[in-house]
Amino acid sequence: MNDCPSPDDAPDQAVPTPGNRWKLSAKPMSGARWDNRWEETEDTGETSWKKIPDLRLRGSIAIPRENAPGTGVPPIPLTVYLLAILLGFIASFDVSVPRPIMLLGSAMIFIPLFFKSLQYPLPALMALIVYIPYSKAVSGNLGGAVTGLNFTTAIMLLCFLSASAVSRRDAPLAVLPGERSFRHLVVLFCILGAFSVIHTDISSSGFGPLSALVDYKRWLDPFLVFFVFSYLLKTEEDGRLLVTLMAMSLVVIGLGTFEEHRINGMAHHLVRLTGIAQQANQMGAFYSNYLMIMIAFFMMKGLGLRRRFFLFFGLGGSLLGLFMTESRGDALSMAIALMFFFFIRSRILFLGIVALLAVAILNAQYLPGGLGTRLQRTVVHQDANSLDQRTTLDASARTRLALWKGATAMIESHPIFGVGYKMFQSNIYRYVPKNDETAHLSLRNRDAHNAYLLIGAEMGIPTLLVFIYLIFSMFRVSFYSFWVSTDRFWKLVCLGTASTVVSLAVTNIFGSRFNSMIVTGYLWALLAIILKIPIWQMNKISQQKT
């Protein structure tokens, strides 16, 4: 081993062969490190020793003042912009599209998209990015002859066809161990989810194989988004375009919130905004999660005055939408994610955000959209002239506490396999405490209002532990990509993604948001994209050296 060659003797370009493990440039270079291991290789019948390059990159939390030369925010095709605006218009103004027009429009979009996707996967990926937030508001039931055939399924099928065509023509992009391990973890969680569905199908007479398959496919949709982007995306340029398109789609949704605010303002009483999620708490989670991505883009260099102008109003609309959902848990998650984002980005801005949040909490009555009123009603003070002068929580908070206690009891009763997928609501009333405090609460057929407890109750403690580790891994891979990237664009995108994971981890405490395509679809796409950053970074360094 003392006769091993030095790193300087390594070849300039590594050539993968069956007898060695070279994957990237073999010479030590700025931004990369050497492993201390050596490997015996047999390339020409002779035994030699070669040093294995370490796949880890040196990193930093410092965000460059400018993007790397030749990079930045890419332009988006006009037709894609128009499609995003059309979907936003239909969802925001609640436009009812006649079936003949919908089918004709679908044919005009999907037929050209089909042929383009066979040549290159980017068109199908762009269509998926534009459509994900509207998967419930504009579901696009294509005929009803086949169960589950809608726009989501159609675009997914296009992506799979594109993957099949591209895999036969192009060489796959190298996959680093970190991305491979994360894929395996997601697969494990999906398999455990399938076991839960099978458990329900076996133990419940109300579930048939077809209904179980459709339900599982809906539960699986967000994870399919991850795998579609993970296997189809190859180039950094495509990644930039898709992330930019995502940010611009969020702007369209934020601008549409102003119209919903106008409609709700015409009501004689406060109405919680349900938005494109068609449910107030889920819509609040959507705003809370993806405000971080919009803030990250607002800090981009080279964004352009016009884009920055629309992004500013999109941000304002999303913040207003969060207030209009009146979701206290989502507001809390947004505050925590904001503090995390600016703590990493700038200590001065972090102190400003903390001061701003403190002022908002102390003056909650002035918050728009009804959130301030709901925050003030959380704690109920009894009339001083009443015999009972206790301070209690409002009915909503007391209901959640009772449901959480019931979910805990359910987990204790079924610790390994749980009660089965989608069986929580039909079983919860048996486990909630029955006393004077819960006597007047509505506790039958209720959701857990906590993703962790819901997964533990329906799927068991082993699946819950995998889920918690999955959340941790989502944060770890986003922060690692943030750490190793040297480009301002990707630094901010990765920081926004890590902040979104922080927001999701908190919103899961107050609601069952994790398997919602609308709430988590973009996050899974982002994770698949930023997992490519280390390999893009190493390829870039290798090209600079050669």
What would you call each of these model-derived segments?
Residues G140, G208-W219, V271-G284, N450:
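Short aromatic-rich membrane-water interface segments that cap or initiate transmembrane helices
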Residues N264, L320, M324, R345-T391, ...:
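A membrane-periplasm/extracellular boundary helix in multi-pass inner-membrane enzymes
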Residues A267-T274, L387-K405, S413, F417-M459, ...:
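Long extracytoplasmic/lumenal interhelical loops at the membrane interface
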